[in-house]
Amino acid sequence: MRMTNVTKGKAAVVLIVEDDREMLSLLCDEFWSAEYRLRQARDGDEAFQMVLQSVPDLILTDLRMPAGGADYISRLRTVAPGCPIIVMTAFGDARCKSDVLKAGANAYFDKPVRVAELKQCVHDLLANTSGDADKAAS
């Protein structure tokens, strides 16, 4: 099992990747708690560099942004194989969802996101610290 902050009894590190300032602010407000330590990135390249430096316990990311897309999810998966990845997008369809899940995402949400469902998904994936729980939501 991958040692994470969760398995060590510490606050989980969640990397939130979002290029829209309002959405980033909303997500940070929703996940701000003693339970999570938040890190932020504004695009796929910045997120990738941050993950190279230190793998978070979970990545919550937009899909359609600079340096985003299914290839971005594949790149993240190669450097963080056990880290749960949740993808959100406002421009998805069934094929997009399939491509993203095949690329290595653990969960997929269409925007606008139902915050309660997103929080439950984050909680569930962090509870399974191996990151192997494939769960898809829409």
Protein language model features and the residues they cover:
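The short loop immediately C-terminal to the conserved phospho-acceptor aspartate in CheY-like receiver
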Residues: I59, L63-P66, F91
